């Protein structure tokens, strides 16, 4: 057995300014769920109400299968899928991304806020741009034929890691087989990134950030240069696709900050909020 501090699995740690921190809701840690929503209230947009697919929660090995079941019989070409996720399984994310690309969907980052009213069987919601796309979610974002990232959204990356060593990754022991898994998945990530038309710099930045350090927030300039974001619009505009409507879609000291996994951590620049995160198990 050997000890090492190298990249392996998939998950993230988030560092943000205290005043702008958004505590992650519990729904983001549950397995990813998909649903169809129509913009509302109806009286505010009328016939121009947009439709999108929400994708909220953690990416698991079963997520690609769940998405395929959801997509079956629906016309999703050109439809927007709004991501709100703290990442998860490497292989699950790659399979999900390829399924999204095959369907020709548009990706964005956004939190779906359901409304209480239901009009004609359509579930109404609004799409909030203040949302997170963390860890492997950033690679799913790459899958869109068009990719939109609102200025209020946060896309963050870090190294992949073996999920069963999540409790103390620096003290855990690793075998040669573990190293093989890590190298294999890094290679798959590189191939996928190029396949989706993204810049390999995305993977390079991610691999520089160990999972015990705060996640790396990608700047607007980086999102554009790495082609994580292809649309120039500053606000996510859900698209229901061409000739598609909702009916067709049918100092290192830490202190607890809140119940969402956030902690107050000392740093050279003063106190900052960071959030512990689940790690990927392959």
Predicted regions and their residues:
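Positively charged n-region of N-terminal signal peptides that target proteins for export
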Residues: 1-4
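Charged, glycine-interspersed solvent-exposed loop segments at helix/strand-loop junctions
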Residues: 123, 158, 163-248, 252
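Electropositive, surface-exposed helix/loop patches at the edges of structured domains
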Residues: 143-159, 188-201, 271-282
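Short acidic/polar alpha-helix capping motifs at helix-coil junctions
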Residues: 31-34, 59-62, 169-170, 183-187
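Short helix/turn-capping signatures at newly exposed starts of structured segments
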Residues: 19-23, 92
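Bacterial N-terminal signal peptides
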Residues: 7-17
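Cleft-lining beta-strand/loop regions that shape enzyme active-site pockets
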Residues: 32-153, 157-159
């Amino acid at each position: 057995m050997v000890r090492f501090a190298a990249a392996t699995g998939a998950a993230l740690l988030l560092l943000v300014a205290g005043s702008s921190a958004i505590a992650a809701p519990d729904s983001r840690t549950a397995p990813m769920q998909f649903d169809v929503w129509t913009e509302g209230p109806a009286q505010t947009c009328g016939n121009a109400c947009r439709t999108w697919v929400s994708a909220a929660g953690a990416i698991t090995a079963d997520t690609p299968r769940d998405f395929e079941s959801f997509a079956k019989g629906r016309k999703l070409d050109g439809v927007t899928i709004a991501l709100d996720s703290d990442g998860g399984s490497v292989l699950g994310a790659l399979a999900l991304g390829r399924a999204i690309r095959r369907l020709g969907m548009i990706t964005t980052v956004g939190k779906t806020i359901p409304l209480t009213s239901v009009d004609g069987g359509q579930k109404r919601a609004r799409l909030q741009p203040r949302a997170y796309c963390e860890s492997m979610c950033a690679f799913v974002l790459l899958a869109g034929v068009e990719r939109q990232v609102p200025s209020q959204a946060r896309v963050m990356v870090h190294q992949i890691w073996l999920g069963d060593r999540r409790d103390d990754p620096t003290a855990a022991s690793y075998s040669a087989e573990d190293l093989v898994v890590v190298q294999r998945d890094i290679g798959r990530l590189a191939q996928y990134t190029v396949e989706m038309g993204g810049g390999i710099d995305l993977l390079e930045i991610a691999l520089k950030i160990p999972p015990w350090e705060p996640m790396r927030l990608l700047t607007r300039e980086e999102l554009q240069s790495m082609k994580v974001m292809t649309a120039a619009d500053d606000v996510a505009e859900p698209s229901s696709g061409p000739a598609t409507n909702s009916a067709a879609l049918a100092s290192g000291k830490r202190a607890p900050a809140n119940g969402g996994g956030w902690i107050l951590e000392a740093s050279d620049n003063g106190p900052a909020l960071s959030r512990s995160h689940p790690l990927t198990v392959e």
